[in-house]
Amino acid sequence: MAELNINERQAGDVTVLDMAGKITIGEGSVALRTAIRRLLEEGRKKILLNLAGVGYIDSSGIGELVSSYTAIGKENGQLKLLNLTQKLQDLLAITKLLTVFDVYESEAEALNSYK
């Protein structure tokens, strides 16, 4: 089983990636990078990462989140985060990245924010 499982679904013009597992150096961060790059190549620029199932993220995973955010921003797209675990929220607060990302607890609220 891969470190990170990603299920993709559409909610209107927003692509939601439901993620479960770990975003770590190696398979996890590569899986995220590959998914984001593919979506951008397909012209899908409104992306919501549902991180409810992500139990662990290391510095490589954090780096990949930032890299994804930057890549999507360069394409005039938007990357937003949904359902952060307390551990991940604390990590983003410590690294001052909580102020960079738009973070939501409600999927409906997150989806409405793209309009």
Regions found by a protein language model. Give the residues of each.
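Amphipathic alpha-helical interaction surfaces in cytosolic regulatory modules
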Residues: 23-101
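Residues at the C-termini of beta-strands that transition into short coil/loop
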Residues: 20, 107
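Short acidic-hydrophobic, aromatic-tinged amphipathic segments that line or gate anion-handling sites
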Residues: 102-106
